[in-house]
Amino acid sequence: FPTRRSSDLVCTAIDEYLDNTIKKHELTRADKEEDRIKHVDACNANTGPIFLTYRAQDAINQVVDSWRQAHDPVYDFVAEDGITHRAWVVDDETVINGLVEKFGGVESLYIADGHHRSASAVKVGLMRREANPNYTGAEEFNYFLSVLFPDEQLYIMDYNRVVKDLNGLSVEELLTALTEKFEVTPKDSEPVTPPQKGSFGLYVDGKWYLLTVKE
């Protein structure tokens, strides 16, 4: 579990989304996309970055580490949760161009979070291109805001959800209802870790169950 993580806050080309350099792994909902398209278009800005990751590159790490060691951060503070946040601005064109070149050698980027935000930003960019047929590619609408984390600095945590109540059902009624879509297997007192895709751990009334989606 790494205690320090660093990322790059950058603008990423929508063309890399369109040509599948940026890999997606979730489907999106049209209504959520439409809501975000309206938001980005009205604000004329990406107000939340897309969380991207990539296979770590020593050459990129070295440039970032060297800059961080040679310069003071523009922001340095401890949040209420005790986590220290520091931000550096890379404002040397030579260093920036070098990083752009090195990232050009990264084969793929992967969306860790932000499928709806990225899809919406790309669609707004395409709308702006259609409205500006003489665009050069340098306009801001050709990019979206993103943070890039090397994979070695990621830690994937459990995606747990706590349900407030059973909506009037008893535990027995809940388990019976679940059998319509899941195989429900009672387990021991130890927490259930999903062993495969389509499986879930359920903790209710002091007991654990393994839920497996029926075909």
Predicted regions and their residues:
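Surface-exposed, charge/polar-rich loops and edge strands
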Residues: R4-E215
